[in-house]
Amino acid sequence: MSRPFGASRARILAAAAAVAVSALALAGCSSSSEPADSADAGYVTPGKLTIATGQTAYEPYVINDDPASGEGFEAALAYAIADKLGFAAEDVEWVRTSFEAAIAPGPKDFDFNIQQYTITDERKQAVDFSSPYYSAAQAVVALEGGPAEGVSDLDGLKSLVFGAMSGSTSAQTIDAVVQPDTTTQLYSSNEDAVAALKAGQIDAFVIDLPTAFLATSQYIENSFIVGQLPLGGIADEWGVVLAKDSPLTASVSAAIDELRADGTLQQITDQWLDAEQGVPILQ
């Protein structure tokens, strides 16, 4: 994962209205049957589907920090998953968690959590993951007129001071792919990394590409995307988080697989995250 901030909000809202409405409508009149014996099936609340997102949920994943609207890539996807599981929109309940708390060992107050979590073997020791629903590229964000301007390859990045959110795939990618001359500065949130960039404490930070588009278009004045980073052996596939050994893992994975097979997942992705074309990959 990387977080917060994709495409301009105005364009996103206009492009995705149909998808959001469609996802909610499908959930409201699901062809699936009502979940049977919800308590026995492992749901937190019988007859309800409890979904978690971040303490603050960011665009383009959730619009206006309101996941119940179904607007945003992960909000729309959550309702599409709910529909596949047999839940109407009104039977979906949202809760909030911090990023780290959701992947810590122990019981959960949610049935699943959708918050741009990268699937890793280390995290699998504490929680379950669904089938992946998105593969995210990592991007370098910097200020115009700063040390990163004019950089067009990996060698040009090495002399920069980088920042990233602690524990994120972005931080791992910096060290594994860029291998900068200085130690990567780690922050508790992407907001802190942005503040450090604005203060001149770092030259650039790395974040997932959809978030980079939103950051540069709305949140960081005079900023730009330097380019995408090659994978370098680090996969950044996002999965839904569930409690370890959850009885719901198989059914949630099956729902995502069905959404991929019937084209719904691609439709939602295209509507909300279609700004990723045209950014060069730095080699």
Question: In which residue ranges do the predicted regions lie?
Answer:
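Bacterial N-terminal signal peptides that target proteins for export
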Residues: 1-16
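C-terminal motif of bacterial Sec signal peptides marking the signal peptidase cleavage site
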Residues: 23-28
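Extended ligand-binding regions for polar small-molecule ligands
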Residues: 30, 75, 80-85, 168, ...
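Extracytoplasmic small-molecule ligand-binding "clamshell" domains
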Residues: 36-113
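Periplasmic-binding protein-like
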Residues: 55, 135-142, 210, 217-257, ...
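Bilobed "Venus flytrap"/periplasmic-binding protein-like clamshell domains
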Residues: 56-58, 70-84, 118, 139-192, ...
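Acidic, polar ligand-binding/catalytic clefts
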Residues: 92-154
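A ligand-binding cleft/hinge motif common to bilobed small-molecule-binding domains
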Residues: 101, 117-126, 175-176, 198, ...
